[in-house]
Amino acid sequence: MRMLFVTGGRLIGLTLFLSSCLSPFHSSCGDDISRRPGTVTDDSPNSQDSSAAQRGWMHLRTKPYLPPDFDQTVFENLWQRWPAAQRGQAAAASSAERRRMTFSYYGLMAPPGDPDSNVPLGYVDTGDGHRVMNCLACHAGKVAGKVIPGLPNSHFALQSLTEDVRLTKLTLFKKLGHLDLASLKLPLGTTHGTTNSVVFGVVLGNLRDIDMNVDRSRPEPAQMHHDMDAPPFWNVKKKRSLYADGFAPKNHRVLMQFMLLPKNDRETLISWEDDFKDIQAWIESIEPPEYPFVINANLAEQGRVVFEANCSRCHGTYGLNGKYEQMLVPLAEVKTDPVRLQALNREHREWMRDGWMSRYGEDHVDVEPDGYVAPPLDGIWASAPYFHNGSVPTLWHVLHSADRPVVWKRTENGYDQQRVGLEVQEFNELPQSASSAHERRSYFDTRKSGKSAAGHTFPDALFESDKQALLEYLKTL
């Protein structure tokens, strides 16, 4: 995938690939940074079986692997739970406009090419009016107003949606579902666009023995609740393991961990293995989107030189001969928020290492990771906010650690071309006008546990001119 820029009467081709959260990126990447044995990947085209990838996409869009979350009647009545001002607007709106308002309010995406769909992209229609969540609820988002499957959904208001679904069901005398009940004890996410997904995996895994038999006798695990920013899917093909700390093997079984509700017994999970092999093929077939705005090619070329001298040791190189080798940067060096690393207990990691998820240890599981993976930066322009917890709204803020906002709020469809990332308002405190829980969740407060924007200060050593050139280059990746 290439984009051509005209500069000085010449055409310059810059290879464009695009990425994830800008975690550790260092001028020297000291000797203690871990390069564990694994596959070295390059920018050659992905050779996935296209038919498997197509099947994987259809599985996600059409197969209900979980119980329903709500039905169409509940969905059409959610607006009645909103604050008075929005409720009044919804009451006066047409049904089509009210549906669009509901999608916007909860950060739901319409399927690409079908903006009038009643079924959000992140849900499966069961055929009888019920909706079942799929992976795309968190892993299909929009940037600059465009919906992109595989992009993190930085709008998704899972906690607000679940609370309003529960209240609406009670009003309509409908049976509560698994998420309605679980969320009474387990927080789903304190900021729109992030979720408590790590703890979801711990809790669900704790209901199984290592062979995937349902086992409710296991003691309840320690739970360190915190929010995570979903990574972009298009970088999975470059990685040899999964998650911010790289502890889990990259295989189709690990992708099934959010399907571990007791309703899905061992035999059911095993029957889905081929489906999830296809889903993994689809994930690894995704290419990142190209930067849609103007790029200063001369400045970007200067930025490439800065990047390769200062950042490439951790984050790889890009272009025709680019290479990325996955690297774990110790927490003591990167100094980003530690809660994610602390939240996964050793017992959970050993459960994965010893059991079915890792093919009984055949696939490597790191039970003692001491830091975070420096991710590939393909599509970095699109995948804001940055860091594993989504605490930094733009790449400019990544490069200027002292200027990262304490509290920030994004606009719905705006894109900051100058700072490269989310268009945001910045605050020193949470505004008192944010009176409802839903409204408060639209603000990212970096003072909360697990939400710190500290760390990754390596770019502070660069001259400002180098930072501006680097910012321009990152648009081209």
Residue positions per predicted region:
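Bacterial N-terminal signal peptides
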Residues: 10-24
